[in-house]
């Protein structure tokens, strides 16, 4: 059934997005998207250079799991278009749509560096998954956009590699190979959620 495939695909994309915030090497890829201190349509195009490389292994599994490649492609286009619309401060709350969809309000929360907004609202098209998994947070207080400690640069090279540089530095300073692996695959902490290295 196509609608079941779309629903499962949406939760699958949500899980990948969550991993992009909870696994440090994936956060090193994704954090450039969150480094903007503004929230507007242009932020949706501020994508990681290595994002496609990190997504390929994850999303290649979908056809193996039985997802129709055509539906995956169409869902990818819809998701991209919805993602552009979601990066705005122009659109306020959308009434009953807020209960089901990942609206601009919900996505503003996701881009917030306010403590109560960190690691919230990973949803792709639907916000119901975040409500089910306990990662939902409504927009209540004004959102402070950007990283915990912002990058203070517009240099795209620095923005792209800042997470990698900080992670590699921590790995170099680790006491063992096992500790290095924990740094690479472990969660980012407050320090590594920043743009300083």
PLM features: residue spans?
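Single conserved hydrophobic/aromatic residue that forms the stacking wall/gate
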Residues: 1-12
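Juxtamembrane helix-loop transition segments at the membrane interface in multi-pass membrane proteins
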Residues: 16-33, 98
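Alpha-helical transmembrane segments of multipass membrane proteins
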Residues: 56-64, 80-84, 128
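Cytosolic/stromal cytosol-facing helical appendages immediately following the last transmembrane segment
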Residues: 38-42, 85-197
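Core segments of transmembrane alpha-helices
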Residues: 48-61, 123
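Juxtamembrane helix-capping/reentrant segments at transmembrane boundaries
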Residues: 31-47
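Transmembrane helix interruption/hinge and helix-loop junction motifs
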Residues: 64-74
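Transmembrane alpha-helical core residues of multi-pass small-molecule transporters
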Residues: 9, 33, 78-82
